[in-house]
């Protein structure tokens, strides 16, 4: 095999995106950025548009990229992007984002030329910075909305008012990532895989935080509030395990691990309390975001057992056992809360198997999340016998039968939710129809079964909750996926090839 000594490529791109809305027949005049929903033109059978729509967004991008390769052994790539977004204030609309990466294909070196069982071996290293403007319009410039009530001289009057609090100092959220990777293919491409380890950091995080009223009109405002660190690795291994004339078996396994931590969230001592529970019976918030706290931890009281009357006992801030409520004194105060558990799985696994025998094919897809916790609002709200109006769970009279108290926000409701799931099974048989008709080459009859079975010791309804964002790990009361078990679905079909 011969390869060119040198190869290079370069490109540059200019990109512009505009988003506009128009309406007319407004009932009033003299208001700046129009409230799209007030004009009647779009509501008279031509189109519908809710009040408060964002009228305009604009994104401009200048992009350049260059690649260089020497004998398909050493590869370098560089890119630069300058982007401007109308979502930010006048002084912060433009951001510069770049990336640099390199690769070394070791398998093309002379010292591996005679190693027959190595088909491909490559290492990669890259670093890059990207920007995020993923929020709605109108956070930096005043927008108005009709038909709301606003206080005027102590009297609530209908009219125009601001859609949200504005922050003219908003700027791009930036994510930087350092990545090292290894790719390999061995034994005539019968075994392949890759490994990646990464370190990501998000600076100037965009997040909507609580705002004081007054002086602000609304109770939240968008801010750049801090930085987030993200570390992890990903591993994939695949193999063409059995290959014969009539039978073939291939499989691939994917493993990943990720950990996130808030490095900075405003000044020291600043925090954000998150995840408010439903009313009635709202016991407070279950997550606290602050400096040097791992994402996924719960901020709740630590369960210390029950007293002889079935009342809650907790650990206070000094790890001493105290009653949750002692007469008229309540120990359910923020300083007695603890950071406990973690809702981010230590390992996320997926494993697929494919079998082919003559005209038959069978595939099985497995998934697993290992060593993570879930806070079940469902158990907390519906799992106590004395909440007779709400109680619908058998556990109120079995697992929780000794609790004679009202619900409190404690780690009693947190369970290890590790699971192994048979996600899907596909079985098919292909009929060769070419000798019967010239119009149809083949027909494949298939049966697909989804959500086949879940193996877990989790005490809630569904261990597979949302594990993304800053508040992962909750089985919510008002979420359909949490309130009802997953159903197994069967699909029988025919696929024709013409």
What are these regions (language model features)?
Residues 8-286, 414-498:
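Extracellular/periplasmic, surface-exposed regions of secreted and cell-surface proteins
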Residues 1-2:
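Short, exposed "boundary/linker" segments that immediately precede the start
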Residues 153-163, 201-225, 259-344, 352, ...:
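Surface-exposed, extracytoplasmic segments of Gram-negative outer-membrane nutrient-acquisition systems
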Residues 252, 335, 345-359, 423-428:
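Conserved SET/PR-domain catalytic core that frames the SAM/AdoMet-binding pocket
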Residues 359-361, 488:
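A common structural microfeature
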Residues 12, 99-101, 352-354, 363-365:
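Predominantly transmembrane beta-strands of Gram-negative outer membrane beta-barrel pores used
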